[in-house]
């Protein structure tokens, strides 16, 4: 019930928003957010690939570090890899730890070298992920040149925990092989025999060495012989690796190696790219066969090919990042598919709206077309007599007439009939003409 003097105010009309306008405004915002997410994901992937490339570089390169007397020598490898000592030197060099070189001590620098350096570094740092070694003359045995400044120089590699190991007995042949586009990289090699190790080369009870007799120079021999090749063969004997043990001790060669992709090994050592392909060599080794003629498979080195072991180690070290990359790639694929479907549906709906608008502009077009079709069907002749055929012939010869032309034609026909009728009357004939004759004239 309304009170007198108070009138209800009409509701304020709300602006009507066209549904197509909202559909046109929303997609740019969604595409902007999608582009932003794509940039973030790509930056994460690039960062992950950079870290992975750095990881492989640390595994393949030779690392060299030094420390002077009184300092600590720090050796460290990335996760899922251990230290493999290649060489060690402890001696006198004034260029490394001192700016002056007294003339009286120039000759002593050649003889001031500790012979137990390599073995000591092996005992402290071999197969360790990190190693901190105090550089002091008492650590490496008797001081051969007291009072002089000395330093420790170590060269090492970081070998993955999961590598290929091969042991070959003395007087047997060592064969190393990698698949296409991958080449050998030797991490460690020892030739000899350990004291407490059982004999893996013979079932007979043989003489055991009283001490570990190992030759670490086997690493240099195998590196010169097999590094950067796909196949390598060598006879394990004292001629190639020397004789570190006493006579009668059965020795064996233990090798740790990996097959590294060509592009990664070339990035570390460009000299690998200059190697020329060769056939079988005289001593039984196999050269690198970059383009075998018998192979019909198209070979293509990927831009980002990695060692399967290193990739597995990287995924284990970064599970969250690997999961993020996988989920992000799936999301990007779904988002692109959704965008394609949305664009397709939007375009189809806009096309239908446009077609409907055209039909509304010409509402009677369909009806006019139907009427014209009915008229054409009615105009077909139903009889086969001569007047019907003649009239049909006339219609086909004059398909379309305007109203003015039709009036002129009717007037001409009427005049012609009058003239013909006058001629018949003047000639004294019957004035009645056949109907079909008048139509003929």
From Swiss-Prot:
One of its GO terms (cellular component) is membrane. It is a single-pass type I membrane protein. Residues 368-383 have a biased composition (Acidic residues). It comes from the Eukaryota. InterPro entries: EVA1_dom, Lectin_gal-bd_dom, Lectin_gal-bd_sf. Its main location: membrane. The keyword Transmembrane applies. Residues 49-322 are extracellular. Residues 1-23, 362-390 are annotated as: Disordered. The keyword Ribosomal protein does not apply. The chain crosses the membrane at residues 323-343. Residues 1-48 form the signal peptide. Keywords: Glycoprotein, Lectin, Membrane, Repeat, Signal, Transmembrane, Transmembrane helix. Residues 67-159, 168-260 form the SUEL-type lectin domain. Binds heparin. This is Protein eva-1 homolog C. The gene is EVA1C.
